[in-house]
Amino acid sequence: MDLNISTALRSFTQRYIDLWQQQTGHLPASKDLYGVPSPCIVATGEDQVFWQPQAFLPEATLTNIERALEIQLHPDIHDFYTQQYAGDMMADLGNHRFTLLQVWSEDDFIRLQENLIGHLVTQKRLKLSPTLFLATTSSEMTMASLCNVSGNVVLEQFGSDKRTLLASTLSHFLDALRPVLPE
């Protein structure tokens, strides 16, 4: 049975929070997001913020991208990026370590849309089938992305057609991820 994206994302996020609480005794923390406003922040430490996910309000979609590029985006990407505000979360899948990208605030949502447009424009210019990034890796040139045509999640090399299947659906990808703490 295929979980819907909202359920799969909530489940992964809860596993990530549980890991933080088991290993550190507190909610997820970020030094990188210190000083950046967000509805997720529940406490501020000396040089870090502690966060927990918040509902994405007001409701939103990525239709601005669709209008700007005259493209229909895979429905899973709308659900993935508009369910919650949260910090980025680290996870492993097989031999790969990912930083699952999340929306931190309304301003971050605008930035995300601009970056997705840039990504899609680059792919169109290079005559590559469209993908939408979901997670980064330690390499600036490799990322996990949703194939806009098939809905598969692939490991792709930026700017090339080199793609490796990671999961048949986004919900399967989220379900298979194993949360890890940042090093």
From Swiss-Prot:
How is this protein situated with respect to the membrane?
Peripheral membrane protein
Give the record's keywords alphabetically. Cell inner membrane, Cell membrane, Membrane
Show the InterPro entries listed in the entry.
Answer: Syd, Syd_sf
Q: Which domain of life is it from?
A: Bacteria
- Gene3D superfamilies per the record? Syd protein
- Principal localization reads membrane
Q: Name where it's found.
A: Cell inner membrane
According to its record, what are the GO cellular component terms?
cytoplasmic side of plasma membrane
Family of the protein in this entry: Belongs to the Syd family.
Query: In UniProt terms, what function does this protein have?
Result: Interacts with the SecY protein in vivo. May bind preferentially to an uncomplexed state of SecY, thus functioning either as a chelating agent for excess SecY in the cell or as a regulatory factor that negatively controls the translocase function.
What is the name attached to this protein's record? Protein Syd
Provide the species name.
Yersinia pseudotuberculosis serotype O:1b (strain IP 31758)
Question: Which gene does this sequence derive from?
Answer: syd
